[in-house]
């Protein structure tokens, strides 16, 4: 029996199990051993579910039978398992979810085995994953660097081969930012593509800006995962256009010559775009031009206006306040200032000043901004290429605000100190368009740099076809973080 490298993607792992080259038990036990060896260094998996995984692995059936995955510890829950949203009070309560989210149900139906839950900043309200409840997640490429956020645990886990794929959610870049700084592929699909239900929270609370997303190390895994988890369910607020065929079937096809716009500067001008981030985007653009696409410097004019962030920040304040209230309902007592981080409580105080009419006005402004962004695609452009983040990967602690920091005049605790991380991602949460971060660049100090590609609403098919083209032209699969030991193999039986 041959050995298997845990760096192989989910598609390859599934084929090895299916062909009998390795058993699902061998795959799972090797993955668990790898998590136990590596996770103490990076703190990506905060709630291991190894015994549950062993039970479910024996019963798994479907195209990915026996392949492990990880779930972000935020809003999308698994029955019987601890759920904290990285809230101190929730962790102390020992609360366990009483149902499986639709995402979890669909992953199980495809044969995936839930291995554990990953770290997130408290309620996902930061762009670095350093919650008080669980501690910081560290970047496998450099343990002193951030993994981004808010799906930082999932991004780091996939980068370190703790699982081939993982779940995340994205309200301002929370999948794409960790994908960029951890060197993996991260997809935020079209609004309504993946159901957040049956307990719908972020989908409504962030006015449709929060979307369930996916992490993998290959584009083909992202396509296959999207086929597994896509689809409207009862109670969903939004519904994406139905795909004409499975995404996994279409990614190898040539999409023809497309009109591609490129943005490699900050159109607002309030800070300078990091030169290495810009260079990575230009490299991707050059590769697409060489493949026959019509590539030009062009972008939606709306990206030069960030005034919408004031309204978005108000909506985020209200969303956090409601999440604190809802989590208190789950444990049978109100969560207080002592149960949450100080920045979250500041957001609650701000939310208490928001009237119903003011909130409705903020939603209206976001809808107006979304239309301005989307009209660029309506004018005949197919794709936009731009850096995922606009700065180098921050150090651990760099983006955390010291308690008592004066927030007066800042847009919110959610935005403060983090604009350069999310400036190029949050517009597409508001517009609801699909966007993917690809690990195309490397910085001079050895850190990954992601390049973002954005398609028109509902056009994940086109997005994934072009992502696959770039994966072929600028292969990244051989890159592995220093932490990952390539010799860690599944032992022969």
Curated annotation (Swiss-Prot):
Cysteine pairings via disulfide bonds: none
Activity vs pH: Optimum pH is 7.3. Is stable from pH 5.5 to 8.5.
SUPFAM superfamilies noted in UniProt: Amidase signature (AS) enzymes
GO molecular function: 6-aminohexanoate-cyclic-dimer hydrolase activity
Pathway where this protein functions: Xenobiotic degradation; nylon-6 oligomer degradation
Keyword flag Transit peptide: no
Active site, renumbered: 72 (charge relay system), 150 (charge relay system), 174 (acyl-ester intermediate)
Regulation: Strongly inhibited by 1 uM diisopropylphosphofluoridate and 10 uM p-chloromercuribenzoate but scarcely inhibited by 100 mM EDTA in vitro.
Role: Specifically catalyzes the hydrolysis of 6-aminohexanoic acid cyclic dimer (1,8-diazacyclotetradecane-2,9-dione) to form the linear dimer 6-aminohexanoyl-6-aminohexanoic acid. Is inactive on 6-aminohexanoic acid oligomers (degree of polymerization 2 to 6), various other cyclic amides, cyclic diamides, linear amides, oligopeptides, and casein. Allows the bacterium to grow on a medium containing 6-aminohexanoic acid cyclic dimer as the sole carbon and nitrogen sources.
Keywords, ordered alphabetically: Hydrolase, Nylon degradation, Plasmid
Temperature-activity note from the record: Optimum temperature is 33 degrees Celsius. Loses 50% and 100% of activity after 10 minutes of heating at 45 degrees Celsius and 50 degrees Celsius, respectively.
Catalytic activity entry: 1,8-diazacyclotetradecane-2,9-dione + H2O = N-(6-aminohexanoyl)-6-aminohexanoate
Regions annotated as coiled coil: none
Family listed: Belongs to the amidase family.
Gene Ontology BP annotations: nylon catabolic process
Matches recorded under PROSITE patterns: AMIDASES
Family annotation (Gene3D superfamilies): Amidase signature (AS) domain
Protein name (Swiss-Prot/TrEMBL): 6-aminohexanoate-cyclic-dimer hydrolase
Lineage: Bacteria, Bacillati, Actinomycetota, Actinomycetes, Micrococcales
Any matching Pfam family: Amidase
Biological source species: Paenarthrobacter ureafaciens
Superkingdom of origin: Bacteria
EC number, as in UniProt: 3.5.2.12
Subunit structure as annotated in this protein's UniProt entry: Homodimer.
Enzyme class: hydrolase
